[in-house]
């Protein structure tokens, strides 16, 4: 089992089914590992659903440009107020408009 780190950062999330967004919100990361992220949620989310996350990242590109960690994955555990997402794919992006980051 990978090490989990207690990292608290702002996160925007979307639950998607096909091209349809059925839930969206914002919260905080609770802990992160190389394969999973646990976040707070405003609603109870369904286990097994596809999810996209955009996490405000503390490091800056060239000391001047703020970054986001964008993650696609699946909800592997869900409880009222939080969810765990298995990381399927991730990439770092420069911060833009919230919805623009989540759109792709």
Where are these regions (language model features)?
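Structured alpha-helical
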Residues: 1-104
């Amino acid at each position: 089992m990978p090490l989990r780190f207690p990292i608290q950062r702002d996160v925007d999330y979307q639950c998607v089914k096909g091209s349809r967004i059925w839930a969206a919100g914002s919260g905080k990361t609770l802990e992160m590992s190389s394969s999973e992220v646990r976040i707070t949620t405003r609603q109870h989310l369904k286990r097994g659903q596809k999810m996209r996350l955009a996490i405000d990242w503390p490091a800056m590109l060239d000391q001047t440009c703020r970054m986001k960690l964008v993650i696609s994955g699946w909800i592997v555990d869900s409880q009222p107020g939080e969810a765990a997402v298995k990381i399927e794919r991730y990439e770092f992006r420069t911060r833009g408009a919230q919805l623009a980051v989540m759109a792709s």
